[in-house]
Regions:
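Substrate-recognition/specificity elements adjacent to catalytic centers across diverse enzyme folds
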Residues: 3-177
Length: 177
């Protein structure tokens, strides 16, 4: 039988008979604890932050839509193997069940902003993965280039080539690793 135990630190431990139940429970418990945050992620993936948080985020929506996060995520779902899609669907079903449970009495953040949590589907999950990959990879390339130039030519040449390079954010050369 499936069971969930929440430890003294508030961390849920899920014991499931199969992967579908595991992913469903993971989605449900994530939404139970972080529904507002997850809703902001959902709006972000779709490039619709301004619809939830105001017109000052239109530039963010334009940026996210320019990168075609959601469009690409939809295509990615179509390229995934059926088992992976099934598990992502189970995860989304858990989230959506939690949304249904609280829909008529939403957490305070939703009431204050007068918004409803959007439903989840596999393209939101893969879109969030794409957003995170982009976010985490956005600064590594310049740092590698800076480090290579500094290691090969020295710090003075680096500053000559990149005059705006800051010593406050030094690169870590390969020999330092």
């Amino acid at each position: 039988r499936d069971s969930i135990y929440t430890d003294t630190f508030g961390v849920p431990h899920i014991f499931a008979q199969n992967e579908d139940d595991l992913f469903y429970a993971a989605g449900y418990y994530a939404a139970r604890d972080r529904l507002f945050q997850m809703s902001i992620v959902n709006f972000s993936v779709r490039g619709e932050l301004s619809s939830a948080l105001g017109d000052e985020l239109i530039d963010s929506d334009i940026y996210l839509r320019t990168w075609r996060i959601h469009d690409t995520a939809k295509k990615l779902v179509g390229e995934l193997d059926p088992q992976t899609v099934q598990l992502i669907n189970a995860f989304c079903a858990g989230i959506n069940y939690r949304i249904q449970e609280v829909y008529n009495d939403l957490p305070i953040e939703f009431k204050l902003l007068q918004i409803k949590p959007p439903a989840w589907n596999p393209s939101i999950v893969t879109g969030y993965g794409r957003m995170m990959a982009r976010e985490m990879s956005s600064s590594w390339k310049p740092e590698i280039v800076y480090g290579a130039i500094e290691n090969y030519f020295g710090k003075e040449k680096l500053k000559e080539i990149y005059p705006y390079y800051s010593d406050e954010h030094p690169t870590i050369g390969c020999s330092s690793l």
